[in-house]
C-alpha cells in the first residue's frame, strides 16, 4: 500500500524557499511575557450534574466555609447531599502590561466527579500567582462547548463537559511591573536559536538605525540600544518589530511521533542512494467456542470451552532501491515508493539514519 498522502502536509508547508519575516514573528522582547494565575472555586447552578458530595468531601467543606463567611452557620455534623455544586480549578494568563480593571479570559476545570459544568456559574474566586499574591478575581457564567444526555444506561456525549471558559471572566486587581529598556537597552530573544538569523537581525537593525545599535550576544539573544524616553522607546521598539529579516535555513530534521505514526520533515532533509527491504509480519489468533455434550443418561455436565488457532503470516520481503534526493520532494517521492505502513516507515527511517543515508537529525517524540 502506497502512502502518497503521508508526507503531503510536510511537502506543501515546508518545501518553499525561505522568505522575509517580521522580527516580531521570529523574536520576542526579553521580559515581556504572560504570567500564569490559578485559583480554587465553586461552580453553582448545575442541573444535577455536580459533584457527589459523599465522594468529594472538599466540595462540602468549601460550601460550609463559604456559607460561614456569609453568616450562615450550619449545625455540626450535618450531611449535605448536593448535586448542583462542583469544586473547580480556575486558571488564566495575565498578559504583559495588564492594568488593574482589565478583563481577562479564564478556564474552569472540574477537580471532583462532576458530570458536567454546563449551565453553571463560577462564584468569586481569587487568582494567585507563583508568589502567592492575588492578581485577579474571577466570576461569571461558564461557556461549555460540549453536550451530553443519558437515560436507561445509554449515554451520548459530544466534546468535553468538565471544562469550560468564561470570556472576560476575571478582573485584574494587581499589575506586574515590567522593566522595558529603562536601562537603555533591551534583549531580543529569537524563538529558534540560529547564528545566521541572529546575525541578520543585527545587520537589519544597524542598517536602519545606525551602526552599533544592535549586537548579537549568542545564537538566541540580540542586544539593542534603546532611547531613554518612554514614548520614544515604544515607537523605537515598534519600528524594530516591523523590520523584515530572512531567517537562516533550518537544520535538517525529521520528527517522528511514535504514538500516532506521524512523520514530519523540513525542506533541508536529503537522502543518499540506499536499498531498503521490508516485509509484513502478522499474527492472527482466532477463537471458536466448542461445546462438550455428555452422553445420554450420563451424569456429566455440558461444558463450553474455547478453542484457539494461531497463524503467523509473513509476506515476502522485497529489496527496493531508493534514489538519492537533494530536495524535499525527492525524499518524499523515494519514501512513498516503498509503500510501507506508518509504523514500518518509522523503523525504516531509523535504519536509514543509522546507515548514514538519511542526512538529517532524527527526533522521536
Curated annotation (Swiss-Prot):
<keyword id="KW-0574">Periplasm</keyword>
<comment type="similarity">
    <text>Belongs to the FlgI family.</text>
</comment>
<dbReference type="GO" id="GO:0009428">
    <property type="term" value="C:bacterial-type flagellum basal body, distal rod, P ring"/>
</dbReference>
<dbReference type="InterPro" id="IPR001782">
    <property type="entry name" value="Flag_FlgI"/>
</dbReference>
<comment type="function">
    <text>Assembles around the rod to form the L-ring and probably protects the motor/basal body from shearing forces during rotation.</text>
</comment>
<keyword id="KW-0975">Bacterial flagellum</keyword>
<protein>
    <recommendedName>
        <fullName>Flagellar P-ring protein</fullName>
    </recommendedName>
</protein>
<dbReference type="Pfam" id="PF02119">
    <property type="entry name" value="FlgI"/>
</dbReference>
<keyword id="KW-0732">Signal</keyword>
<comment type="subunit">
    <text>The basal body constitutes a major portion of the flagellar organelle and consists of four rings (L,P,S, and M) mounted on a central rod.</text>
</comment>
<dbReference type="GO" id="GO:0005198">
    <property type="term" value="F:structural molecule activity"/>
</dbReference>
<dbReference type="GO" id="GO:0071973">
    <property type="term" value="P:bacterial-type flagellum-dependent cell motility"/>
</dbReference>
<dbReference type="GO" id="GO:0030288">
    <property type="term" value="C:outer membrane-bounded periplasmic space"/>
</dbReference>
<feature type="signal peptide">
    <location>
        <begin position="1"/>
        <end position="20"/>
    </location>
</feature>
